[in-house]
Amino acid sequence: MKKESLIKNYIKEIVNAPFNLTAIKNEEEAFHLLALDSLLPLEKMNLIGNFLDVGTGGGVPGVFIGIMFKKLKGTLIDASRKKINYVKNVCIKLGIDNLEFVHGRIEEQIDFIEKFDNVFSKAVAELRIILELTVPYAKVGGRILLYKGKEYLKELNDAKNAIDVLNVDLEDVVEYEILDRKRVLLIFEKKDKVNGFPRRYNRILKNPL
C-alpha cells in the first residue's frame, strides 16, 4: 500500500474509533492537523536510527513518522492502555510493522534512558515539562523534536532553566503553517548525559525546572 493511502486509511480508523481517540472527527481536517502537521516540518530532514514518541495518544506523530520513514524503528508510548492498544491493532491491520507499542508512564521507563536517536512529542505539555519527559531518553548527540504553536517564544523563555539543567541546545526552529495556523518544530540536541531525570510526574508538575 502506498504511503499516502496508508496515512488516509489510518486517519479513517482513528477518526472513527469507538471512543474519543481524537477530538477531530473530520477526515480531511485530521489529514491536515494530524498527518501534515506531523510530517511537513520533517520533509527536508535526514532521520536515521530509531525514535520514541512520548504521549502518542492516537498515534500522533509516531504512526505518521513510521509510515513515511520506513527504515526508522519507532517506539510509541502512552499512559492510556485503551488508546495504545487501539493504535497497535490498527497498525497491525494496516501492515505497519516498524513500530512497537508500550503502555505506561514515560517517567517509569528506566530501560529507555539514552536509547533513542530521536525523541518526539506533540501536544503533551508545556515546553519545560515535556523537555524533562523526553531529554533523558535521547542518546548523547541525539535529537529531541517537539511540536509547538504560536506561543513557542514564551515557552522557550520559561524553559531556559530546563534547557540548561538538561544539557540540551536549541539546534533549529522549523516554522510552517497548517490551515493558516502558525506552527513550529523545536529541535534540540542533547550535549551530555543528564542524571536524576525525569523525576516523578507529580514533582515535575509541582516544581517544574
Curated annotation (Swiss-Prot):
SUPFAM superfamilies cross-referenced by the UniProt entry: S-adenosyl-L-methionine-dependent methyltransferases (SSF53335)
Binding positions for S-adenosyl-L-methionine per the UniProt entry: 55, 78-80, 106-107, 122
NCBIfam families in UniProt: rsmG_gidB
Protein name per Swiss-Prot or TrEMBL: Ribosomal RNA small subunit methyltransferase G
Gene source species: Thermosipho melanesiensis (strain DSM 12029 / CIP 104789 / BI429)
Gene Ontology CC annotations of this record: cytosol
Compartments it resides in: Cytoplasm
Keyword set, alphabetical order: Cytoplasm, Methyltransferase, rRNA processing, S-adenosyl-L-methionine, Transferase
Role, per record: Specifically methylates the N7 position of a guanine in 16S rRNA.
tRNA processing listed as a keyword: no
Molecular functions (GO terms): rRNA (guanine-N7-)-methyltransferase activity
PANTHER family: S-ADENOSYL-L-METHIONINE-DEPENDENT METHYLTRANSFERASES SUPERFAMILY PROTEIN
Entry EC no(s): 2.1.1.-
Top-level EC class as recorded in UniProt: transferase
Keyword Transferase: yes
Main location: cytoplasm
Family: Belongs to the methyltransferase superfamily. RNA methyltransferase RsmG family.
Gene3D superfamilies xref list: Vaccinia Virus protein VP39
Gene: rsmG
Top-level taxonomic group: Bacteria
Native organism taxonomy: Bacteria, Thermotogati, Thermotogota, Thermotogae, Thermotogales
Pfam families assigned: GidB
